[in-house]
């Protein structure tokens, strides 16, 4: 089912009309196809809100569990033509299954990522749609939100750099490393959204990830007071990034 690495016995695949679901039975043992529909949670009074972006992320509170439900949507010009549909090749290459399995592997390795709960694709002819459910992290907010609220300490910037380096040392190339996909809590830094991410040998792409993050930081702070993001802050992040984790290979 994984194609590249072993999944634990708690991971199951179930067929649904026109597609399949992949899920962790320890987190979603009674998974239903309806769980991927926001209106289902709304009808039960368990939809807590939503975060808008390229694709809405819905916040769900199910019993004692807090989850994020996301429907895959295109960005840019392609969104005008296909919105939420992607070219079908095979099950393994569907965006929800690929992201779920990579996130599963990262979480199992102890990296600061949300635990994957379930993923689904539905195939129709030569295209498919997809959805994913992940754990909602107990965070203060995204890096963007925190910067809008006030300046961050140099210790926080160093921690952000260290976090990114942990992923890069293990060859995790984040396809969209930006200020929205870095989450902060009182004690931890997390990365989210591993759609289209790849495992690669560390190389020039690592610098490309950092350049992308820098552009994002400049974009989200350009209208804010200048002390919200300074050169000293960026150098603090780079100082943290230079502190290698020493781990260079993900466990199988």
Please give the residue ranges for each predicted region:
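AlphaC helix of the protein kinase catalytic domain
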Residues: 142-151
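Hydrophobic residue at the +6 position relative to the catalytic HRD Asp in the kinase catalytic loop
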Residues: 177-184
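Conserved ATP-binding subdomain of kinase catalytic cores across diverse folds
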Residues: 33-141, 165, 169
């Amino acid at each position: 089912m994984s194609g590249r690495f072993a999944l634990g016995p708690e991971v199951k695949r179930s067929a649904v009309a026109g597609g399949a679901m992949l899920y962790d039975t320890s987190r979603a043992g009674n998974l239903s196809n309806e769980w991927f529909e926001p209106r289902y949670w709304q009808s039960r009074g368990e939809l807590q809100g939503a975060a808008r972006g390229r694709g809405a992320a819905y916040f769900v509170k199910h019993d004692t569990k807090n989850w994020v439900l996301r429907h895959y949507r295109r960005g840019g010009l392609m969104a005008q033509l296909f919105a939420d549909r992607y070219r079908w090749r095979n099950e393994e290459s569907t965006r929800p299954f690929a992201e779920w399995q990579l996130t599963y592997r990262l979480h199992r390795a102890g990296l600061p990522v949300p635990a994957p709960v379930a993923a689904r694709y539905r195939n129709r002819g030569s295209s498919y749609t997809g959805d994913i459910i992940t754990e909602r992290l107990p965070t203060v907010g995204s890096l963007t939100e925190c910067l809008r609220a006030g300046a961050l300490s140099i210790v926080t910037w160093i921690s952000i750099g260290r976090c990114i380096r942990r992923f890069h040392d293990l060859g995790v190339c984040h396809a969209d490393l930006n200020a929205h996909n870095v989450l902060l809590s009182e004690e931890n830094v997390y990365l989210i959204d591993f759609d289209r991410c790849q495992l690669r040998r560390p190389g020039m792409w690592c610098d490309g990830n950092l350049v992308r993050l820098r552009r994002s930081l400049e974009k989200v702070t350009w209208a804010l007071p200048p002390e919200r993001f300074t050169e000293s802050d960026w150098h603090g992040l780079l100082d943290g990034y230079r502190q290698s984790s020493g781990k260079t290979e993900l466990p199988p």
